[in-house]
């Protein structure tokens, strides 16, 4: 119930419009706060330890300290896991009725700012998306809005987060439509637009008019189209590597039960990687700024491997190593207790991919009239990786165009993003955010039918008003139970309430009046075995397949040890399906 709702007399649609504006402002402030905290921490630590980043051995320890602080905060203060923010927002929509715990309105900002501020090799985008989603969800719950409005407001918060941190309102809307709320209707666009615009205005007001990736672009030339095709294919290959390597590393490290041993291993590994490859420090956006403006990234005095940058052919090799190792540094940061996302690393890897392709082509064409604009390829590569890793080509195209002012590169952005998306899709059906959710059968899709089945839970449709009998009860006892029941199915249990089968009224109709056999016939003489069982925690999609295979109208619900729970029926499921479909599709 809402504690205080001064606009409760308004229609829910009007309440939603007002709240979307408020959510946008609040999330915009949260995005500014996160960026400011990260910047202050990084500058303060740099001043405290002095010198250039990679020139100090202290930076071997700094990222690990940040990871430890974030881990202790999550373990002992909020006592919750808050990593993988975008994935958790998706889970909130599909499995938790769009409800997110109140502490997520601030905890992700606190933990991620420490993680990244100390040099953790992750992005700030996913934590702020989860923060925004939590703000939208809790505002809606506080105001007593419906599930549908709560879901839209959750999306408004996520969209505002992207818009606020990148100053890209259109990209924020597209992010929600492509990645987060697959089944949102077009009439929900106005709240999304209001929230993204208000968040962007807040960001511009407090942080100035500069965009995150200001760059010097070269006018697009049609003769370079074949090279953008090559870039698209390369980005697709990098996307597949990014998704598969990340998930496999997380699974392998996740098997370690001792969190402190896990932290030590990840902290040492991350420290060594950053010491050898300084661009892996933090989000890496400073290095991207250098590449986007066509400048050479100076590594002298920063790393023992600086000599690799002195030979022309060593430069693309060095950056290729950075590209490959960014996935490791990101995963080590998250697995070791840090809080951050894959959004920023995706942009980083995409930029490096674009640079490697452009620099390699320029070296191959050395001495010819052909010249590949490296800064253009850096920018377009960012879109290519986003399209592949996130499976969101529209978001990739418009985000890169908005944050760079690179609308002149629309054609190569579209071309590269489409090819990267298509290449990745051939091998990986799901994005890095949705793969694990899809494997558990919890992913909402654009298919309304599948979305409703995902939202339905077996626990919502279980019927428990069936009179049970024991397997060794007599016919007389069975007739007594039948006379007191309004059902025509009677579950049969053993002595410890494990389901054995069922008796139908039709099975005993002819024997009900044969009183002379009341003590000689028993329940097991009439019992039928169930063709299939339904488990309490089973996905509704699986349940419907069992109904289809068996042609049954009712199926028993049991726990994993076959303890009887109840029955589910087609009629109850269809009724719940209609009700849920109305909620999902209403405007």
Where are these regions (language model features)?
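Alpha-helical transmembrane segments and immediately membrane-proximal extracytoplasmic
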Residues: 1-455, 459-465, 469-490, 494-500, ...
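Phosphate-coordinating loops and pocket residues in cytosolic domains that bind phosphorylated ligands
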Residues: 191, 463, 510-514, 528, ...
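Structural signal for short hydrophobic segments within the conserved structured cores
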Residues: 465-469, 525, 530-533
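The conserved cystathionine-beta-synthase
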Residues: 469-486, 493, 512-515, 519, ...
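Glycine-rich acetyl-CoA-binding "A-motif" of GNAT/NAT acetyltransferases
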Residues: 499-502, 563-567
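Nucleotide-binding motor/catalytic cores of P-loop/tubulin-like NTPases across gene-expression machines
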Residues: 505, 520-523
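Ca2+-coordinating acidic residues in Ca2+-binding motifs
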Residues: 507, 525, 569-572
């Amino acid at each position: 119930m809402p504690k205080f709702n001064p606009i409760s007399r308004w229609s829910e649609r009007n309440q939603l419009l007002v709240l979307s504006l408020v959510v946008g402002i609040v999330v915009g402030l949260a995005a500014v706060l996160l960026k400011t905290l990260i910047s202050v921490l990084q500058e303060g630590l740099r001043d405290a330890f002095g010198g250039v980043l990679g020139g100090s051995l202290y930076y071997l320890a700094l990222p690990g300290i940040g990871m430890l602080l974030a881990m202790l905060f999550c373990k002992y203060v909020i006592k919750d896991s808050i990593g993988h923010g975008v994935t958790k927002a998706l889970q909130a929509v599909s499995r938790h009725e769009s409800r997110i715990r109140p502490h997520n309105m601030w905890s992700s900002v606190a933990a991620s700012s420490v993680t990244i501020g100390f040099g953790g090799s992750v992005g700030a985008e996913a934590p702020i998306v989860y923060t925004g989603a939590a703000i939208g969800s809790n505002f809606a719950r506080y105001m007593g809005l419906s599930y549908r409005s709560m879901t839209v407001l959750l999306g408004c918060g996520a969209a505002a987060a992207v818009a606020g941190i990148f100053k890209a309102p259109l990209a924020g809307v597209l992010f929600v439509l492509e990645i987060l709320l697959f089944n949102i209707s077009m009439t929900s666009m106005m709240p999304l637009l209001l929230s993204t615009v208000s968040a962007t205005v807040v960001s511009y007001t407090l942080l100035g008019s500069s965009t995150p990736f200001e760059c010097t672009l070269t006018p697009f030339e049609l003769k370079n189209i074949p090279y953008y095709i090559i870039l698209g294919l390369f980005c697709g290959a990098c996307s597949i590597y990014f998704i598969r390597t990340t998930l496999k590393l997380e699974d392998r490290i996740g098997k370690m039960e001792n969190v402190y041993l896990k932290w030590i291993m990840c902290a040492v590994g991350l420290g060594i990687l950053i010491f050898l490859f300084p661009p892996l420090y933090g989000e890496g956006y400073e290095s991207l700024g250098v590449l986007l403006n066509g400048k050479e990234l100076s590594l002298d005095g920063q790393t023992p491997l600086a000599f690799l940058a002195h030979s022309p052919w060593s430069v693309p090799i060095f950056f290729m190593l950075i590209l490959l190792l960014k996935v490791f540094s990101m995963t080590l940061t998250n697995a070791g207790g840090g809080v951050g996302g894959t959004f920023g690393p995706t942009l980083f890897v995409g930029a490096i991919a674009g640079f490697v392709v452009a620099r390699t082509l320029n070296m191959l064409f050395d001495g010819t009239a052909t010249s590949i604009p490296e800064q253009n390829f850096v920018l377009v590569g960012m879109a290519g990786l986003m399209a592949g890793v996130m499976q969101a080509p529209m978001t990739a195209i418009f985000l890169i165009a908005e944050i760079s002012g690179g609308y002149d590169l629309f054609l190569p952005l579209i071309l590269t993003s489409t090819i990267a998306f298509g290449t990745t899709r051939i091998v990986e059906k799901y994005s890095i955010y949705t793969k694990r959710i899809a494997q558990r059968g919890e992913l909402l899709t654009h298919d309304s039918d599948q979305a409703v089945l995902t939202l339905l839970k077996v626990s919502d449709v279980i019927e428990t008003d069936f009179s049970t009998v024991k397997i060794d009860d007599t016919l007389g006892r069975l007739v007594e139970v039948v006379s007191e029941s309004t059902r025509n199915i009677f579950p049969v249990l053993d002595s410890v309430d494990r389901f054995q089968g069922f008796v139908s009224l039709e099975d005993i109709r002819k024997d009900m009046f044969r009183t002379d056999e009341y003590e000689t016939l028993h329940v097991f003489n009439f019992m039928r075995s169930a063709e299939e069982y339904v488990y309490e925690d089973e996905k509704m999609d699986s349940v419907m397949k069992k109904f289809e295979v068996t042609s049954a109208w009712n199926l028993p619900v049991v726990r994993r040890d076959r303890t009887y729970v109840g029955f589910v029926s087609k009629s109850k499921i269809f009724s719940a399906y209609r009700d849920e479909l109305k909620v999902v599709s209403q405007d």
